[in-house]
Amino acid sequence: MMNMKEDKKNTMDMKNMKHHDERKKLNSSQGKNEIIFPEVAESKKDNNGYKNYTLKAQEGKTEFYKNNFSNTLGYNGNLLGPTLKLKKGDKVKIKLINNLDENTTFHWHGLEINGKVDGGPSQVIKPGKEKTIKFEVNQDSATLWYHPHPSPNTAKQVYNGLSGLLYIEDSKKNNYPSNYGKNDLPIIIQDKTFVSKKLNYSKTKDEDGTQGDTVLVNGIVNPKLTAKEEKIRLRLLNGSNARDLNLKLSNNQSFEYIASDGGQLKNAKKLKEINLAPSERKEIVIDLSKMKGEKISLVDNDKTVILPISNKEKSSNKGNTPKVSKKIKLEGMNDHVTINGNKFDPNRIDFTQKLNQKEVWEIENVKDKMGGMKHPFHIHGTQFKVLSVDGEKPPKDMRGKKDVISLEPGQKAKIEVVFKNTGTYMFHCHILEHEENGMMGQIKVTN
């Protein structure tokens, strides 16, 4: 027969179990901010056939809410990290740099590699130190991820921003969407709590698993997704510290479940709901071709909106725009401004073009984790024609001959450029302080 002491202990245990299983209320996304997608990490192949990457764990600042900057962590940036795209058979070499003020490791979650380079707690890289690892990819296509794994600071470092995706790309042809950032979309779902609109792990930490009240997708608060009327592939990662997700579409539409943690299924499954545990990945394909302006949402537990999805029609001009020959990426704010990652160098010619030759330039104002700002882009010595903005016909006030085009963060335009004279000309942001801080390049026009 149970005595009173044992009965009291069991009652307390039951209360604790109930408490541990409770989910903190998660507020729905208001759908105010378009999500952005992590950049794809660049690699260089060396003479031994290795693809060389560099990943740097570093401190940063992120404006989750306007004019409120949080201290965050990121790989090669302020928050999260670039996507590594690998293929089966690739030989890979990665320089790992710790620019934090505490120990960290680089763990390759789901990657089947030698334990010496797995990045567990015993493989610490001290502050200010670096090391280089090598491995060969020996598994089929899958969506994996990388994150720190130091003891005892894994939870804190992941919560503050250290996460990134690693793709082993499709090894065989299939009909799944594969255009990164267009219809093949990396979706990192996390939950966090903000204190006075700022991230503060120490004030929100829970030893039984930290859950937040605010949903983020790819580091964006109140996220939304605008997609074309076509099939889209969502590579879902539950990057939360502790929250389980039960995901479905708000209109109860079915979708194709095509891949689990370990890779693609032999046969896709038609489902209406999936569970996603912390660190788990699943890939689904949603058919938006019949939406015709309808709005749906990816929801958790039937009610909490994780990601509103709205529809934009396919461009009627698809295929009519000539091939792009030059790409311009405008990035940054203040004195951290660049064009294609470079500061102006008077001794460097960035592009060349033939006299009287029509070329199409693609101008992109990159929206980063700080949000970015509008940049007016100017080319010397010519007048150009705006062909499209974000794949659509340009607005009426952008038509006619122009020498300046102003783009909001995240916007991308195509312009037709012809030079009628030879020589070396400048192209730059026409915010004068940005120009003087190096947001400028040179093009040489020859016969």
Swiss-Prot record:
Determine if Metal-binding is one of this entry's keywords.
yes
Could you tell me which residues belong to the region Disordered?
A: 1-28
Q: How is the cofactor bound?
A: Binds 4 Cu cations per monomer.
Q: Where does Cu cation 3 bind?
A: H149, H380, H428
Compositional bias per record (Basic and acidic residues), positions renumbered to this chain: 1-25
Please list the GO terms describing molecular function: copper ion binding; oxidoreductase activity
Q: Does the keyword Oxidoreductase apply?
A: yes
- What cellular component terms from Gene Ontology apply here? cytoplasm
Its localization reads:
Cytoplasm
Listed A to Z, the keywords are: Copper, Cytoplasm, Metal-binding, Oxidoreductase
State the Gene3D superfamilies in the record: Cupredoxins - blue copper proteins (2.60.40.420)
Q: Which InterPro entries match?
A: Cu-oxidase-like_N (IPR011707), Cu-oxidase_C (IPR011706), Cu-oxidase_fam (IPR045087), Cu_oxidase_CS (IPR033138), Cu_oxidase_Cu_BS (IPR002355), Cupredoxin (IPR008972)
Which residues does the record give as Cu cation 1 binding sites?
H107, H378
Q: Please list the residues that bind Cu cation 2.
A: H109, H147, H430
What Enzyme Commission number(s) apply to this enzyme? 1.-.-.-
Q: Which residues bind Cu cation 4?
A: H375, C429, H434, M439
The domain of life for this entry's organism is Bacteria
User: What role is this protein assigned?
Assistant: May be involved in copper homeostasis and oxidative stress response.
Protein family? Belongs to the multicopper oxidase family.
Q: What is this protein called?
A: Multicopper oxidase mco
**Which species is this UniProt entry from?**
Staphylococcus epidermidis (strain ATCC 12228 / FDA PCI 1200)
Write the lineage as a comma-separated list: Bacteria, Bacillati, Bacillota, Bacilli, Bacillales
